[in-house]
Amino acid sequence: MNSCFGPRSQDLVTLRQFDRLEDVPDASRYFVLVEEHPDSINDPTFFTTFQGANGWVDVPASHHERACNFLFADAHVETHPWQSARTVIPVRFQFPILSGTAKDPDFRWTYERTSIAGR
């Protein structure tokens, strides 16, 4: 689940938290659920924030021919194909997993659909 939805996270310092569906300015723009890479699962939420030079805190899955499913706040689903080979990571059952950078087009796409700036 997108860390910007539901109970407030102390880790969110740059993105707005959506407590209710009414708080989402454009429900078709922001995802609620995403498939997380098995090697990246470490808690119940999916964080998309900048972590130093590494773009990903949690890494999305690529189970669908180099693509990942996203469920948006308006209830539509998108299967998004990844552009960067760095996002398509084989499952190794090892944690942690680090991939991509803030300049990565896949990270940017995901980040832009996580929330809006501000608290």
Regions found by a protein language model. Name each.
Residues 1-119:
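Short, well-structured segments within or immediately adjacent to enzyme catalytic domains
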